[in-house]
Amino acid sequence: MSDRLVHLAANLEKVLGKRVQSIEIALGEVTVVVNADTYFESAMLMRDDPSLAFEQLIDLCGVDYQDFRDGAWNGQRFGVVSHLLSLEHNWRLRVRVFAPDDSYPLVASITPVWSSANWFEREAFDLYGIIFEGHEDLRRILTDYGFIGHPFRKDFPISGNVEMRYDPELKRVVYQPVTIEAREITPRIVREEQYGDPV
């Protein structure tokens, strides 16, 4: 384990204090899990404290942990994962926060802290339905405005709910319920005795 990573973890614990749920060092990376109610405050501290100085947000995404590892996950269903970069200290950090309510996933927007979070948060809202409180323009970014549901959720039907097609009589695009029939695919088992033997 690198001394730099241990030093970063110690700085995080010192600066964030009780805002931290856990800090883990694994596979050459530091991951910190922060409380949802102090997420925005923690982000401000990680950016502004000189011992951390995470000036840049590289990535932010939503995660649905509903079927994570076949029931081995006992935590909240929805999480937000961010990756930060400190140019001053040459550190990278993964930050996780979990939405406290699975039926209405809500976390604070960190767009005022790092403006690069803007479209990332819109994407997480569009695909997972995670609400970012305080985001000034939280609307769909990848799916159509009339789209029903959030397609990256584990409980979203694989075939979708509606399909879009061009209607030549109306001369426009129309939406209709999905016409795909569910079918079960059973693998074919080869029962020949000499199958695969060289001739």
From Swiss-Prot:
It is an enzyme of class 7 (translocase). GO terms for cellular component: plasma membrane. GO terms for molecular function: NADH dehydrogenase (ubiquinone) activity; NADH:ubiquinone reductase (non-electrogenic) activity; quinone binding. InterPro entries: NADH_DH_suC (IPR010218), NADH_quin_OxRdtase_su_C/D-like (IPR037232), NADH_UbQ_OxRdtase_30kDa_su (IPR001268), NADH_UbQ_OxRdtase_CS (IPR020396). Keywords: Cell membrane, Membrane, NAD, Quinone, Translocase, Transport, Ubiquinone. PROSITE patterns: COMPLEX1_30K (PS00542). Coiled coil: none annotated. It is a peripheral membrane protein. It comes from the Bacteria. It catalyses: a quinone + NADH + 5 H(+)(in) = a quinol + NAD(+) + 4 H(+)(out). The keyword Cell membrane applies. Its EC number is 7.1.1.-. It is found in: Cell membrane. NCBIfam families: NuoC_fam, PRK06074.1-1. Belongs to the complex I 30 kDa subunit family. NDH-1 is composed of 14 different subunits. Subunits NuoB, C, D, E, F, and G constitute the peripheral sector of the complex. NDH-1 shuttles electrons from NADH, via FMN and iron-sulfur (Fe-S) centers, to quinones in the respiratory chain. The immediate electron acceptor for the enzyme in this species is believed to be ubiquinone. Couples the redox reaction to proton translocation (for every two electrons transferred, four hydrogen ions are translocated across the cytoplasmic membrane), and thus conserves the redox energy in a proton gradient. This is NADH-quinone oxidoreductase subunit C. It comes from Polynucleobacter asymbioticus (strain DSM 18221 / CIP 109841 / QLW-P1DMWA-1) (Polynucleobacter necessarius subsp. asymbioticus). The gene is nuoC.
